[in-house]
């Protein structure tokens, strides 16, 4: 209201200040639709101000603030336009601090839409400037987004290395500071550390980082941070096969996205929750949640998790006996993973295709399992390597090749036991028992 009256009185400076304050307040409580409305009005007000370096700096700041609320709403097309405009403004006035900020968010945008090479380039440029400026907020943001990109590419070792640096930079009270981001980067870094370490089978470390993310988020009671904390814990349990522990955390994360109007944020939750439901026989529920999420993921929103969602849906279709659909979806997952250079999900899709082929085409299944295993070994994806050994062992058992079956099943059992993957260990032990 104050901004409205200031605007009508052509007190544009005051109107801008009021709108920025209102937008920040709405953003702080995750009222992103309200924040967007404030920042869009602020952009209109800026057009009435005389052109100067200070006005241009404000124009960058408002665009970046607007981008912060558009992302949880999944409005990606608007975001890239804002980033283009903000980068041009920062370059024009030689503002390196703001340029680094824009470049780091550009890296995040490219991660979101599955263009990781472009994202890495933008992220490295942002980090280089941040290091030169010795700016902790800029270093933390650029490094986190680079960690996200490495995770997406299946380079889990690189993701872990850079994300652990972010955690080390933000001890004690700094862990609770947002540093200009939507939630504390200490929460974000721990969430993706949990994802990355879980993919390598380091579940104890993954769960520890996930629990830390949730603890920091709970202390602030902030929806965006809470979502990340719950999905971190739930995803690790799901990848481990601890479905009883995974489902409550993931269901809570999904509720947060719905209750807080963050429709663009439920991609990883849907993938892992659907997988968890499938493992305990709730196949219809699994299909429903994954199909709903898939429909949304293919709209103008996040593409980053689409390959993972497709892998999960294909596996659930297989569990439900929908073989033809499973193969179609898994083939799409493989194609998209390869196009987006998501090597971890490429290996996962090949494993799912092996599981599908094992029903009717043993020779093809063997090739799929071996290809998936080779790539998973290269990437350090120990749980997936174990799944491939289990698949090969079952395949050889059905073919009457007891010796090879024994070798692969024993390897799977050893790996599952070392990683404390009890759900999968019991499956493998049952198959070994069938050889007697």
Question: Could you tell me what each predicted segment is?
Answer:
Residues 12, 32, 76-79, 116, ...:
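Flexible, glycine- and charge-enriched loops at secondary-structure boundaries
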Residues 12-21, 134-148, 264-265, 323-329:
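Short, charged, low-hydrophobicity "junction" segments
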């Amino acid at each position: 209201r104050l901004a409205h009256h200031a605007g009508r009185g052509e007190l544009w400076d005051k109107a801008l200040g009021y709108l920025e304050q209102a937008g920040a307040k709405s953003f702080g409580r995750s009222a992103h639709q309200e924040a967007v409305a404030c920042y869009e009005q602020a952009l209109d007000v800026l057009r009435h101000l005389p052109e100067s370096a200070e006005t241009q700096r404000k124009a960058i700041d408002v665009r970046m603030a607007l981008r912060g609320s558009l992302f949880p709403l999944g409005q990606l097309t608007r975001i890239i336009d804002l980033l283009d405009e903000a980068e041009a403004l920062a370059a024009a006035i030689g503002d390196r601090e703001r340029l680094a900020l824009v470049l780091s968010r550009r890296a995040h945008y490219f991660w979101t839409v599955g263009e990781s090479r472009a994202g890495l380039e933008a992220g490295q440029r942002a980090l280089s400037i941040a290091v030169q400026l010795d700016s902790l907020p800029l270093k933390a943001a650029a490094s986190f987004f680079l960690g996200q990109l490495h995770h997406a590419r299946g380079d889990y070792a690189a993701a872990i290395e850079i994300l652990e640096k972010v955690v080390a930079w933000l001890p004690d009270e700094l862990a609770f500071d947002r540093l200009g981001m939507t939630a504390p980067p200490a929460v974000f870094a721990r969430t993706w550390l949990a994802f990355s370490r879980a993919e390598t089978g380091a579940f104890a470390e993954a769960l520890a980082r996930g629990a830390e993310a949730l603890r920091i988020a709970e202390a602030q009671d902030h929806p965006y941070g809470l979502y990340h904390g719950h999905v971190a814990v739930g995803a690790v349990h799901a990848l481990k096969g601890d479905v009883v522990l995974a489902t409550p955390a993931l269901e809570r994360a999904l509720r947060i996205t719905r209750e807080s109007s963050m429709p663009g944020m439920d991609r990883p939750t849907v993938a892992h929750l659907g997988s968890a439901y499938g493992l305990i026989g709730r196949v219809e529920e699994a299909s429903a949640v994954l199909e709903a999420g898939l429909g949304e993921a293919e709209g103008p929103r996040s593409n980053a998790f689409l390959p993972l969602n497709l892998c999960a849906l294909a596996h659930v279709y297989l569990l439900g006996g929908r073989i033809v659909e499973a193969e179609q979806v898994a083939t799409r997952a493989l194609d998209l993973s390869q196009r987006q250079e998501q090597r971890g999900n490429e290996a996962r899709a090949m494993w799912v295709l092996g599981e599908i082929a094992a029903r009717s085409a043993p020779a093809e299944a063997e090739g799929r399992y071996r290809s998936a295993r080779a790539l998973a070994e290269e990437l350090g994806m120990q749980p997936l390597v174990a799944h491939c050994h289990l698949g090969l062992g079952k395949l050889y058992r059905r073919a009457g090749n007891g010796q090879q079956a024994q070798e692969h099943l024993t390897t799977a059992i050893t790996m599952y036991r070392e990683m404390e993957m009890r759900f999968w260990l019991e499956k493998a032990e049952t198959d070994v028992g069938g050889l007697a």
